[in-house]
């Protein structure tokens, strides 16, 4: 059951698609406080949700703020990342209630989940105008399903989007891109996508192509597509200020950009320097901006990634000028003391980026109402995704277009996926990737993944391999790195190349199961990844597991995420069949009883556990998804007590939007 409560005069967010009547009764489970709501947690209570946030699967023990942020350093001390996902799923503990809480509010929401008082959960919106949904059901899976129905079907990408994507900030020419494709082919490594960062643009301006570096983008796209590889270019939120650029000129002439208090366009700098920012909260602006993608779809482009759309701001001219003036004043001093150096010089420079004062200095038009940006800040990136998603429905009707974004809000999951932002090449970030996935998907973002190997810093060959051994299970599987870091395309690691090749081929072999699991999750509002406690709520050990995930109906994964480890502890809430896999054709199996185990797992092995009564369809590996044969399958299985094992498999053309036809489903029995 879903109950809806309204407070004040909420601004529209378009997060939900179901019309739930407003309830006049008391809010269940929660206690009203002066500035928000509270819930008293039992010692064994667990709090899931909040999507893209730091720390573990269980969010208890920390405080958070949903405030979409261009956060370059991912660490446990952070309060927010790129997405605002205000859904909590509370498992109250033995003999207590389970319920979901969705706070539909476009500004900051602050959470204290056992941080100040370990038995107290508190949350408060920055303004008194919001909607609150309370969801109850039979169990955690049922509550999750109801929430997903409330917010609408998750975005479904083309099937080729489940292949490997190779990306880097630093592919500067068409020949660089060709070389990546050539090396993958020569090293017999499967590949479906090459992502282009901002170097393909002319002067970092959206919807332009640098003709010297990429003289014929359409020909390059066609050349790679003939090899089964799609080009996936980036689009940033800031529109470069250039009166000669038709996108800038048209947006300015029609008043499509966000404005300052005096009505003039708001200006801030990002990669191209000074830029304007489209007012994505207006439908006509979304239609206009979405129309610009045609310049690239006309070149044969079928996929995009939207970036810098929190929106990230490097500086505003006004605050940069004030900073320079303060530095000029300091430069006249003979001695700059510690507080002045760290406070005014270092702090002043760092404070230019993503400054709260800048976010409070420009405005949107929301249904004819002028609204200051910081009040609706979290809607911005999601509405850029919406602009693109709605455009693709017009530009490529009946066809699927790949789209994923850095910034998001619940509701934008209907238009595109997300990647988990600018992580780092550390083992801690691998664990963070594992722990973030179920909560992100709980909030509707099914097509999700992290930058494999890590985006910043220099990765190591063993980290690249271990991360791939988890990444081969995530819907979005992309290797991405920043300019200046170690080159980390998989063919670069000579010593690890045989193992990396086998793991990439394993991903493609498992696609019949992974794609079927994804489509079931999207079409039936079930989960792709979920914590063990969802299926085993009465098992206290299962509820506490933070580093194993259930994958669909029939599989559990337990990645190795520590350096130099040759195995790991695994908890099985029921008997399962272990597949210790070195390649599609080289694996050991062992039936393990329920309980605690130490399982050996060499650096070139991955652990896959199949639950009783379930089977996993396995194809022959392929060089790209287009060459995958879904008809010649082997079944890996764990028969139940009756000796049977089965799976539901989904097959379609992978390109069109005809999802619901029943003939796409069939049952396979081992």
Question: Over which residues does each language-model region extend?
Answer:
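Glycine-rich, histidine-containing beta strand-loop boundary motifs that form or position
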Residues: 33, 41-43, 91, 102-105, ...
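Aromatic- and carboxylate-enriched substrate-binding clefts and catalytic-loop regions
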Residues: 190-500, 536
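Extracellular structured ligand-interaction cores
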Residues: 82-86, 96-98, 106, 129, ...
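Catalytic core of carbohydrate-active enzymes
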Residues: 75, 379, 385-401, 407-418, ...
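Catalytic and substrate-binding clefts that recognize carbohydrates or anionic sugar/phosphate headgroups
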Residues: 1-161, 168-169, 174, 181-186, ...
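A residue-level signal for conserved active-site and pocket-lining positions in enzyme catalytic cores
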Residues: 87, 143, 147, 184, ...
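A conserved hydrophobic secondary-structure block that centers on an alpha-helix together
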Residues: 77-78, 154-157, 167-215, 219-221
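Short, hydrophobic/amphipathic alpha-helical packing segments
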Residues: 64-65, 81-84, 178, 286, ...
């Amino acid at each position: 059951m879903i109950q809806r409560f309204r407070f004040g005069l909420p601004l529209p967010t378009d997060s939900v698609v179901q019309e739930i009547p407003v309830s006049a009764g008391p809010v269940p489970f929660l206690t009203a406080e002066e500035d928000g709501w509270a819930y008293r947690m039992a010692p064994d209570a667990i709090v899931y949700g909040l999507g893209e946030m730091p720390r573990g699967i269980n969010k208890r023990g920390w405080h958070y703020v949903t405030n979409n942020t261009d956060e370059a350093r991912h660490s446990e001390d952070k309060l927010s990342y790129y997405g605002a996902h205000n859904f909590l799923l509370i498992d109250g503990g033995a003999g207590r209630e389970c319920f979901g809480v969705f706070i539909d509010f476009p500004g900051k929401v602050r959470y204290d989940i056992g941080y100040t008082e370990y038995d107290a959960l508190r949350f408060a919106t920055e303004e008194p105008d919001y909607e609150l949904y309370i969801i109850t059901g039979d169990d955690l899976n049922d509550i999750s399903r109801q929430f997903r129905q409330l917010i609408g079907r998750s975005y479904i990408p083309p099937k080729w989007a489940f292949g490997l994507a190779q990306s880097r900030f630093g592919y500067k020419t068409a020949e660089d891109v060709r070389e990546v494709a050539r090396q993958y082919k020569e090293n017999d490594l499967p590949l479906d996508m090459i992502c282009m960062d901002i170097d393909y643009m002319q002067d970092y301006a959206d919807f332009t192509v640098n003709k010297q570096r990429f003289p014929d983008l359409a020909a390059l796209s066609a050349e790679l597509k003939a090899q089964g590889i799609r080009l996936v270019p980036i689009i940033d939120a800031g529109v470069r200020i250039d009166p000669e650029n038709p996108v800038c000129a048209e947006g300015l002439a029609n008043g499509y950009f966000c404005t300052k208090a005096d009505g003039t366009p708001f200006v801030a700098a990002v990669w191209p320097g000074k830029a304007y920012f489209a007012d994505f909260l207006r439908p006509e602006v979304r239609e206009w901006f979405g129309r610009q993608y045609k310049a690239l779809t006309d070149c044969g482009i079928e996929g995009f990634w939207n970036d810098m759309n929190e929106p990230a701001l490097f500086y505003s001219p006004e605050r940069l000028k004030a900073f320079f003036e303060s530095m000029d004043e300091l430069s006249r001093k003979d001695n700059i003391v510690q507080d002045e150096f760290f406070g005014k010089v270092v702090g002043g420079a760092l404070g230019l980026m993503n400054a709260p004062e800048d976010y409070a200095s420009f405005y949107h038009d929301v249904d004819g109402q002028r609204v200051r940006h910081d009040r609706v800040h979290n809607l911005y990136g999601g509405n850029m995704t919406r602009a693109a998603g709605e455009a693709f429905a017009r530009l490529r009707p009946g066809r699927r277009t790949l789209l994923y974004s850095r910034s998001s809000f619940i509701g934008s999951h209907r238009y595109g996926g997300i990647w988990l932002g600018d992580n780092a090449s550390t083992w801690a970030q691998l664990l963070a990737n594992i722990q973030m996935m179920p909560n992100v998907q709980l909030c509707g973002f099914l097509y999700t993944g992290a930058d494999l190997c890590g985006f910043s810093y220099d990765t190591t060959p063993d980290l690249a391999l271990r991360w791939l051994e988890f990444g081969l299970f995530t819907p979005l599987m992309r290797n991405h790195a920043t300019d200046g870091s170690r080159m980390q395309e998989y063919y670069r690691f000579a010593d690890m190349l045989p193992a990396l090749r086998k793991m990439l081929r394993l991903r493609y072999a498992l696609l019949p199961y992974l794609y079927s699991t994804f489509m079931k999750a999207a079409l039936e509002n079930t989960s792709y990844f979920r914590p063990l406690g969802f299926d085993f709520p009465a098992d206290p050990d299962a509820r506490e597991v933070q580093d194993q995930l259930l994958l669909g109906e029939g599989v559990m994964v337990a990645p190795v995420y520590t350096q130099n480890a040759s195995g790991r502890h695994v908890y099985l809430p029921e008997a399962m069949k272990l597949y210790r896999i070195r390649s599609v054709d080289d694996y050991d199996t062992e039936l393990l009883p329920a309980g605690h185990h130490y399982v050996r797992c060499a650096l070139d092995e991955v652990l896959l556990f199949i639950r009783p009564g379930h089977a996993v369809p396995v194809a022959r590996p392929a060089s790209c998804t287009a060459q995958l044969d879904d008809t010649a399958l082997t079944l890996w299985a764990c028969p139940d007590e009756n000796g049977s094992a089965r799976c539901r498999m989904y097959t379609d053309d992978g390109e069109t939007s005809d999802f619901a036809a029943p003939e796409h489903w069939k049952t396979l029995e081992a």
